[in-house]
Amino acid sequence: MKNNGGARVVVIGAGFVGASYVFALMNQGIADEIVLIDANESKAIGDAMDFNHGKVFAPKPVDIWHGDYDDCRDADLVVICAGANQKPGETRLDLVDKNIAIFRSIVESVMASGFQGLFLVATNPVDILTYATWKFSGLPHERVIGSGTILDTARFRFLLGEYFSVAPQNVHAYIIGEHGDTELPVWSQAYIGVMPIRKLVESKGEEAQKDLERIFVNVRDAAYQIIEKKGATYYGIAMGLARVTRAILHNENAILTVSAYLDGLYGERDVYIGVPAVINRNGIREVIEIELNDDEKNRFHHSAATLKSVLARAFTR
């Protein structure tokens, strides 16, 4: 039973991402109960102790404890951060074989508890593992969400804000597709306030166009740069996960770029991929189909084809 009748989030995987996510939840007052599950039980116990010692500084009361899969029964949201990490030189897709086996065990254990909530997947390759979570869980696809390109979009908005000297909150631009090497920027629908970005740089010549391309490359390759410097990325994605969690638990109907299931939109079917979607307490209310130009359409189809190729290999063995 729930301790206080409030919103319960179960976090599976108390590594860098999982612990940073719990820290973000706690500091933003998003959840009422947070349960930590990790294969290394000692780590989960230690983290729960550490977080509880900081409860006096939190903006609202929160119950935090280390638990097991039985705690998923009454959870509103299970967030999966567990799995093998990306090493220097590895792509996110290199992690498929290692992590699908881990996910089958995790998801089946969660469902055996009687879980009836939503899944949020953070582990890479996130689009593939969100699809795997959906398959293994048997839940409707709208109740299984991946972090998708939420962090890529945040990086994009940050770098564009720096370039144009405006707050990133006033940059309206999206990265869609695979959370990985085939992702793409939607320049045709990118705005600073109400001004199209392409129009803003028109008069600045070819060098400004090259600047925009460099910004995208820095977005796409950011994880590689961070991993090379400090071994892993976790703060940015933790804050992105907290944002999705708030949209779910507070029933916000917020539009966020998550990994969502496509069943005809964007001309694609049977794939989870990063697209803008409306998120509320029921999960993905709807996917928003952006009007893409021909080049963007081709790049998006290439990204989807890359993911489908990996899925075909992973699920036919």
UniProtKB/Swiss-Prot annotation:
Q: Which gene encodes it?
A: ldh
Q: What is its EC number?
A: 1.1.1.27
Which top EC class applies here?
A: oxidoreductase
Tell me which residues bear Phosphotyrosine: 224
* Binding residue positions for substrate: 86, 92, 124-127, 152-155, 233
Q: Which PANTHER family match?
A: L-2-HYDROXYCARBOXYLATE DEHYDROGENASE (NAD(P)(+)) (PTHR43128), L-LACTATE DEHYDROGENASE (PTHR43128:SF16)
The UniProt entry, under InterPro entries, shows: L-lactate/malate_DH (IPR001557), L-lactate_DH (IPR011304), L-lactate_DH_AS (IPR018177), Lactate/malate_DH_C (IPR022383), Lactate/malate_DH_N (IPR001236), Lactate_DH/Glyco_Ohase_4_C (IPR015955), NAD(P)-bd_dom_sf (IPR036291)
Q: Name one GO molecular function term.
A: L-lactate dehydrogenase activity
Domain of life, per lineage = Bacteria
Q: Where is the active site?
A: 179
Q: Where does beta-D-fructose 1,6-bisphosphate bind?
A: 157, 169-172
Keyword terms of this UniProt record: Allosteric enzyme, Cytoplasm, NAD, Oxidoreductase, Phosphoprotein
| Name the UniProt record assigns to this protein | L-lactate dehydrogenase
Q: How is its activity regulated?
A: Allosterically activated by fructose 1,6-bisphosphate (FBP). The improvement in affinity for substrate occurs in two steps; the binding of fructose 1,6-bisphosphate (FBP) to the dimer, and the dimer to tetramer conversion.
Annotated function: Catalyzes the conversion of lactate to pyruvate.
Tell me the compartments it is located in: Cytoplasm
Q: Which organism is it from?
A: Geobacillus stearothermophilus
